[in-house]
Amino acid sequence: MATHSHPHSHTVPARPRRVRKPGEPLRIGVGGPVGSGKTALVAALCRQLRGELSLAVLTNDIYTTEDADFLRTHAVLPDDRIAAVQTGGCPHTAIRDDITANLDAIDELMAAHDALDLILVESGGDNLTATFSSGLVDAQIFVIDVAGGDKVPRKGGPGVTYSDLLVVNKTDLAALVGADLAVMARDADAVRDGRPTVLQSLTEDPAASDVVAWVRSQLAADGV
């Protein structure tokens, strides 16, 4: 597991932060393509942080509650701390264009659980253009994996380029699919304007140590 950053600058669009009310939890989005390992990462974050924080999770699926069901089955949090939105259409619409259903679900989680510290919002599987509305989350993680080949970071796209943290997942499979991790790290650094990139394998590090450390840094900056 390695963290990479690259100091040279690019012109990037400003991403305004949402205005939070006093006492509102930090909200971190977890997005990325289908099968990249978003739900497994959310599960790992819950396992590592549930002993120190008041947590909740909100998942997005098109027609099912598959991801929420997975998290409940694996008991990463009590069932009532895991909610699901069925988007009924393109996953990015519910996290970027019309976030009403997600905001309503967040309100319900906050009403049910006083003094939440953190809500993880997992998007449905989408492509490299998916990003979260700044009205929905305070920071966003974008997850890709090596199965798509080492060209994926080079292709860029808003998720790869502008997410607050890029995670290159399933690094243990790199040799099997012919992906060069050094190339992926280099190409990610080249487009991310110094934003951090983590290369990880949940098989080798089930605790997702580098991502957990990043989440803790976001919470510390937030005063949690």
Swiss-Prot record:
Write the record's keywords in alphabetical order, separated by commas.
Chaperone, Cytoplasm, Disulfide bond, GTP-binding, Nickel insertion, Nucleotide-binding
Short name of one Pfam family: cobW
- GO MF terms held by the record: GTP binding; GTPase activity; nickel cation binding
Q: What is its subcellular localisation?
A: Cytoplasm
**Which positions does UniProt annotate for GTP binding?**
G32, P33, V34, G35, S36, G37, K38, T39
**Keyword set includes rRNA processing:** no
Keyword Lipid biosynthesis recorded: no
Region Disordered, annotated ranges: 1-25
SUPFAM superfamilies recorded for this chain?
P-loop containing nucleoside triphosphate hydrolases
List the residue ranges forming a coiled coil, or say none: none
Please give the chief subcellular localization of this protein.
cytoplasm
Taxonomically, the superkingdom here is Bacteria
> Could you mention a single GO BP entry for this protein?
urea catabolic process
Give Gene Ontology CC terms: cytoplasm
Indicate, by first and last residue, each region the UniProt record lists as having compositional bias (Basic residues).
1-20
User: Which family, according to the similarity comment?
Assistant: Belongs to the SIMIBI class G3E GTPase family. UreG subfamily.
Subunit structure, per the record?
Homodimer; disulfide-linked. The physiological role of the disulfide bond has not been proven in vivo. UreD, UreF and UreG form a complex that acts as a GTP-hydrolysis-dependent molecular chaperone, activating the urease apoprotein by helping to assemble the nickel containing metallocenter of UreC. The UreE protein probably delivers the nickel.
* Classification via NCBIfam families: ureG (TIGR00101)
Q: What does this protein do?
A: Facilitates the functional incorporation of the urease nickel metallocenter. This process requires GTP hydrolysis, probably effectuated by UreG.
UniProt name for this protein: Urease accessory protein UreG
